[in-house]
Structures are given as structure tokens and as C-alpha cells.
Amino acid sequence: MPWRAGNGVGLEAQAGTQEAGPEEYCQEELGAEEEMAARAAWPVLRSVNSRELSRIIICNHSPRIVLPVWLNYYGKLLPYLTLLPGRDFRIHNFRSHPWLFRDARTHDKLLVNQTELFVPSSNVNGQPVFANITLQCIP
């Protein structure tokens, strides 16, 4: 994953590595009953192990400094470096890895494609998927 605070290594450099998600953790060590109990304890909102790459362009259309946050395989929130207003960046990510976007100063929720959660989809005809970040409209 690029831009992760303190990481310094982009996904392009990590594309050949394999990360084991929770779905691979207990299969050999636990029996069926224990595995079901372990799965029940995992967060519902988390990344799932996917080998399908998705090219993404994250665009900050808000006047705020944006903090992108990736939910890892265990549901832990991992913040990345901030994105200035009017700027964008391109990343290679994996399909079904969820992202949230927050105001870097206030931690207010920001919308991405008019919803609170962004889950990359498959690229169609080789075109990147856009994640357009905007402010919430309060009625």
C-alpha cells in the first residue's frame, strides 16, 4: 500500500508479497468447531484476501485535508498520509479492501462516491476506479 504513514514502500514494490488474512489463519491449527468460533470473533468490516488488483485514483474534491484509512484483514484502521484539497493520487490496491476517509484535523467523516465506505471494484476495460471524496451534506 502506498502512502502509509511510516511505511515508505508502495504497493508496486509489495505486489509480489502475499499477506495471510484471517481466513487463512486457523485452518490447519483448529478443528471445525474452533475455527467457526474464531471466525465469529473477527470484525465484519475488514479486508478479505483478494489477489485481484484494482487501480484506483483517489480525488479530494473537498476543501479539507483528507486522511485515507485502510481497514486491514483484522478490521484495524491503518491511516495513510494526508491528501491536500484539490489533489489526487493513484494507487494499486486489491479488490474488496475497504477504505474510509476522514478530515485530518477534526476526524469528521467524509464521503467517497456519495457514501461513507469505499470498496475497490474490478477495473473495467483496464480503466482505473475513481474514489471521489466530498463533504457530507447536513440537512
Swiss-Prot record:
A matching Pfam family: VHL
**Tissue-specificity statement:** Abundantly expressed in the placenta.
Give me the ranges of the annotated region Disordered. Answer: 1-22
Recorded superkingdom:
Eukaryota
Region (Beta-domain): which ranges?
54-135
Coiled-coil portions: none
> What InterPro entries does the entry give?
VHL_beta_dom (IPR024053), VHL_beta_dom_sf (IPR037140), VHL_sf (IPR036208), VHL_tumour_suppress_b/a_dom (IPR022772)
Stated role: Functions as a dominant-negative VHL to serve as a protector of HIFalpha.
Q: What else is known?
A: Has little or no E3 ubiquitin ligase activity as it lacks the alpha domain required for nucleating the multiprotein E3 ubiquitin ligase complex.
Q: Which family does it belong to?
A: Belongs to the VHL family.
According to the record's subunit comment, the protein's assembly and interactions are:
Interacts via the beta domain with the ODD domain of HIF1A. This interaction is independent of prolyl hydroxylation of HIF1A.
Q: What protein is this chain from?
A: von Hippel-Lindau-like protein
